[in-house]
Amino acid sequence: MGKLTILLLVAAALLSTQVMVQGGGDQPAARNAVPRDDNPDGMSGQFMNVLRRSGCPWEPWCG
């Protein structure tokens, strides 16, 4: 039981240090920032972009 407790404490310490190193917290958005439209063509455009990036198996359909 004691070994399990120590193992859990070490795992928690490692995870917390990893979060502290990688984290940095959420940075507040700039006041003048304009939201970027990542998907201007809607769902169909997003689907076609995925097909183009992954290599569409049927070229006439992909455009």
UniProtKB/Swiss-Prot annotation:
The modification Cysteine amide is found at residue 62. The keyword Iron does not apply. GO terms for molecular function: ion channel inhibitor activity; toxin activity. Residues 24-43 are annotated as: Disordered. Residues 1-23 form the signal peptide. PROSITE patterns: CONTRYPHAN (PS60027). Its main location: secreted. Disulfide bonds join 56-62. The keyword Magnesium does not apply. It comes from the Eukaryota. The modification 4-hydroxyproline is found at residue 57. Expressed by the venom duct. It is found in: Secreted. InterPro entries: Conotoxin, Contryphan_CS. Keywords: Amidation, D-amino acid, Disulfide bond, Hydroxylation, Ion channel impairing toxin, Neurotoxin, Secreted, Signal, Toxin. Residues 24-54 form a propeptide. It holds the Pfam family Conotoxin. The modification D-tryptophan is found at residue 58. GO terms for cellular component: extracellular region. Belongs to the O2 superfamily. Contryphan family. The cysteine framework is C-C. Exists in two forms, due to cis-trans isomerization at 56-Cys-hydroxyPro-57. The cis conformation is the major form. This is Contryphan-Lt. It comes from Conus litteratus (Lettered cone).
